[in-house]
Amino acid sequence: MSGIRADGTGDVGLIIAVKRLSAAKTRLAPVFSAAARESVVLAMLMDTLTAAARVGDLRSITVITPDESAAAAATELGAEVLADPTRQGDPDPLNNAILTAEQVVSGSVPNIVVLQGDLPAMQTQELADAICAARAHQRSFVADRLGTGTAALCAFGSALDPQFGPDSSAQHRRSGAVELTGAWPGLRCDVDTPADLAAARSLGVGPATARVVAHHR
């Protein structure tokens, strides 16, 4: 058994794709230095992984990343780590990384959920409830709080067919994925901008994010 779940009793594999930290969250530049942004991104990943690890439906959690620091943090928390083989300059790096991870993870579980790694306010029960709702559909997704992006993509007995990128919510809908409508405010609150971070903090972020943000503000 791979990943964070110690007992491996679930039937879902979770995938989180993380880009190189030095290139992540540039829209947080108005409030954080480059070095601070890397720390914030890493902390958000740690809080996301920690919350996800308590979901009973998960058999494994896999992080695919080219970043050594992100890989080390994920490994320390018990996640399986895949080195992202996506070449620099690839026109669709995120979806290709997810497809690479899907090929590996689908060999051991019938169902896969892709989750954003920047959900510091996500509660374990929110993800558990979303996975429960997703079981009614072959492909489904959870839109972000603004309704334009995608916080999670779920595939039950089906290929993921990820459509992440600009307006990914609409892209996933057009591809046939069913939009899940639960409230799940923390699950929907991915952090790309200072406004997103403020929204996440108003919900309550995990301890790693709280410490790093307090240190750098």
UniProtKB/Swiss-Prot annotation:
Gene3D superfamilies per UniProt: Spore Coat Polysaccharide Biosynthesis Protein SpsA, Chain A
Role description: Guanylyltransferase that catalyzes the activation of phosphoenolpyruvate (PEP) as enolpyruvoyl-2-diphospho-5'-guanosine, via the condensation of PEP with GTP. It is involved in the biosynthesis of coenzyme F420, a hydride carrier cofactor.
Organism: Mycobacterium ulcerans (strain Agy99)
Similarity comment: family membership: Belongs to the CofC family.
InterPro entries named among the record's database cross-references: CofC (IPR002835), Nucleotide-diphossugar_trans (IPR029044)
Binding site for phosphoenolpyruvate: 150, 165, 168
Name recorded for this polypeptide: Phosphoenolpyruvate guanylyltransferase
Catalytic activity: phosphoenolpyruvate + GTP + H(+) = enolpyruvoyl-2-diphospho-5'-guanosine + diphosphate
EC number(s) per entry: 2.7.7.105
GO biological processes: F420-0 metabolic process
Pathway connected to this protein: Cofactor biosynthesis; coenzyme F420 biosynthesis
Molecular functions per Gene Ontology: GTP binding; phospholactate guanylyltransferase activity
Keywords, alphabetical: GTP-binding, Nucleotide-binding, Nucleotidyltransferase, Transferase
Enzyme class: transferase
Pfam families found in the cross-reference section: CofC
